[in-house]
Amino acid sequence: MSLRKRSAQTQMWESPVMSQGKQSLLELPLKESPPKDSGLKAVPSTHTLYVSHLNPQFSVPVLACLLRDTLERLELPVARGQIEVVRRPRNTYALVQVAAPKAVLASLPWRLQMALEEQLILKELTARGKELVLSEALESLHHREQEDSGPSPSHSPGPSPGPSPGLRHPPLPQLADPSPIWGSAGRRQISQNRPSGVRSDSAIVHHKILGQEQLFQGAFLGSETRNMEFKRGSGEYLSLAFKHHVRRYVCAFLNSEGGSLLVGVEDSGLVQGIHCSHRDEDRTRLLVDSILQGFKPQVFPDAYTLTFIPVISTTTTSTPLKVLRLTVHTPKAQGEPQLYETDQGEVFLRRDGSIQGPLSVGAIQDWCRQKWAMELGKLEEKVKVLTLEKEQLQQQLRQRQPLSCSCCVL
């Protein structure tokens, strides 16, 4: 009787990757068809997404940045605090907490396949010789970790492929809890790493850093806004992910009201800085100029500014710490709406603090209609003002009394 109970419990930890026939037989008696008028299909709920086969050559912050950009391309925006990258000898994977309806998660596999065919997924994110795998298999995480780390020494050898009766799988309360525990842990780590006694008189006001052109490590610059984006930029960021972010954010800022990309600042707004020598500055300037020269319409040098702000730290380092600030100025008003595209022919927009794109043909057409509708509304408003002024002038002319003429005969 105990063996049957344990075998029933271990079946809950088996990998969800099985044949469709077997899966349907297991799910049919457990699932009940919801009522047609329930209307709960589109309600978002918190899920944990399992992303495997990540490139182990890159550091954890770089993988988190690339994975965040990839999920945005799949129309699934997440915050960096909701991504936890785990490195294993045989597999590097990530756990991502997302708030999305079930239908959106169910469509992720074919959307990922379409994105791979259209080359929208960054090749650097996936390990060499493997394909990116997205799944919602919380129960199979422990099983997959055992496969990656090898067989357990307590597992009795035998020809039977099934699980051992004496093998017990510990529960995973941290994965079943939908609360964003990674964000609170990250905030505690930030407060511990902040240098003591560090103060800064610098702050971001109207997209400019006031005070001296220097920042203190641990200073708080505020929160991200529609026109302000922060990137931590540690590890191989400048040589790998920075070029992709230049294309995305500069194109989005050009197609909106401008903005700034700050590298060396955490998402929480704390200044950390990046190790950047004079040679790295020259390489970064050449990289930015070469990318923006391929934009269409042409982006002139006065449309953006690239600066490196020194960061004062309590610890001494061989390479100076700096914050990279790439500012795109507000585009000048043109006779007709302009839509910028990158050197790779992609179009991005900035909406509600997130990047939308690359846009499809239909989305670009909708953008053009909205822009022309806005321009038409401005022209109609000007016509109304001019018409009102004309009526007021005509009314003033009517109210004037005619001059009386009198003749005097001498």
UniProtKB/Swiss-Prot annotation:
It comes from the Eukaryota. Residues 370-401 form a coiled coil. Belongs to the Schlafen family. Subgroup I subfamily. Transmembrane segments: none annotated. The keyword Coiled coil applies. Residues 154-173 have a biased composition (Pro residues). ATP binds at G264, V265, E266, D267, S268, G269, L270, V271. Residues 8-20 have a biased composition (Polar residues). The gene is Slfnl1. Disulfide bonds: none annotated. GO terms for molecular function: ATP binding. Keywords: ATP-binding, Coiled coil, Nucleotide-binding. This is Schlafen-like protein 1. Residues 1-20, 141-199 are annotated as: Disordered.
